Amino acid sequence: MSTEKFTITEHLVPGSHIREYPGSTVNQEDVLKIHVKQYTPKREGPVPDDAITFIATHGVGLPKELYEPLWDELLDQASGFHIRAIWMADVASMNQSGIHNEDKLSMDCSWMDHARDLLLMINHFRDQMPRPLVGIGHSFGGNIITNLAYLHPRLFTTLLLLDPLIQLSPPSLGFGTDAPSAINYTLWRDDVWPSREVAIRANRAIMQGMDPRCLDRMTKHFFRDLPTPLYPDVEAIKALFGTTADSTTTPVTLTTPKYHELVAQIRQNFNARDPKTGRIEVPRDTHADMDPLVAYIPLYRPEPRSTFRRLETLRPSCLWVIAGATFLNIDEIREGVKICGSGIGGSGGVPDGRVREVVLPGFGHLMPFQEVKTVAETCIVWLQQEMDRFRQTERQWKEDRDGKSHLAVEENWYKVLKPIPSGRKKRNDKGKL
């Protein structure tokens, strides 16, 4: 259990100022709070200087606590590196963050906001986060952690992307408007039950195949007791299910309301068509990230495609752990692996050994909760390699810097920049600023 292996410290920090979309909050100046958990290994003795600080990101609507068994496995199996701490924050509209912000949230969501929120979190706790930092993200969290690396290219030593939502086109059975798809299910699903036990039974399909440790956390953190702002009248809900008013069972709902899960999965584009003329025109104030060529579609999600298109520039090394039975477009993800880090500003990519893919056959998108040990083992092999490289690079940097002046430039500057000839006439710059 995580509490046996880690000291868990909770934090509440402000989110980034000015959200990507004006409709993300009730009022545009609202200050959102981000709920953070810091997992510090219980250990004897000092922490090594090169111990890793992990920054982790979760999937849509998935409580951050579901990943705790993965942290346990990383700690148990760690060889060739040490863990300083693991930091994980709920997206502002989800889970514990969502509860803190529920009076300020509205019906829009940009994945880019959480990348900025994490950058502010890291800056806030910088004294506890010396290098190396490693990013690990699952699903849309893999997209978010990649965008954080775009924001600050030298922040992460390496990235671990677990079935990341980075692709050019929507997945089949994923984001189409016709059923079956994830968004149809999200909008039309039941989201209130007479008791936690009934809720667990009703959602057993989602929990199928989960590691018992993850299943335990799912039952605790995926549901929330009523009342909530969405369902304030507990007695009315009890009456709906025929439960007596004096019953001791408490109705529950989803910790992340289904509407916030929906708008994180997909974004509406309902107003691009002028009702009078029928003309399609992108409303730039609110939908500047909409591709004008497809502005006629009513729903879209910009981040998977925009993130894919920047993969060539990704600076940190990167391990892609891909679920062989994922519902995502696996062929497109693998195309992303091929170009990852290969361009100007990038890591060097696959040819330089800086990017690697591992496909886990038969594993589904929820593999961090179903195949915890295998996912951890896959990450550890990569981390051993990357930490060896980090230490070598650090040693070389210190050797190269030894004895250098920090007050004046080195001699090579004088060799490259030629001196101004003596006796040269002074330029007449009168009249110029």
From Swiss-Prot:
Active site residues according to the UniProt entry: S139, D163, H365
Cell compartment(s), UniProt: Peroxisome matrix
Binding site for substrate: V60, F140
Abhydrolase domain: annotated segments: 58-246
Molecular functions (GO terms): fatty acyl-CoA hydrolase activity; hydrolase activity; polyketide synthase activity
Signal peptide residue numbers: none
Source taxon at top rank: Eukaryota
GO cellular component, one term: peroxisomal matrix
Biological process per Gene Ontology, one example term: mycophenolic acid biosynthetic process
Outcome of substituting S139A: Abolishes the acyl-CoA thioesterase activity
Assigned EC number: 3.1.1.-
Chief location bin: other
Alphabetized Gene3D superfamilies for the sequence: alpha/beta hydrolase
Gene deletion effect: Retains the ability to produce MPA, albeit with an about 50% lower yield, and accumulates 2 compounds (MFDHMP-d4 and MFDHMP-d5) with an even shorter isoprenyl chain than MPA.
Enzyme type, top EC level: hydrolase
Pathway involvement of the protein, from the record: Secondary metabolite biosynthesis; terpenoid biosynthesis
Family membership: Belongs to the AB hydrolase superfamily. MpaH hydrolase family.
Subunit structure and binding partners: Homodimer.
Protein name as it appears in the record: Type I acyl-CoA thioesterase mpaH'
Gene responsible for this protein: mpaH'
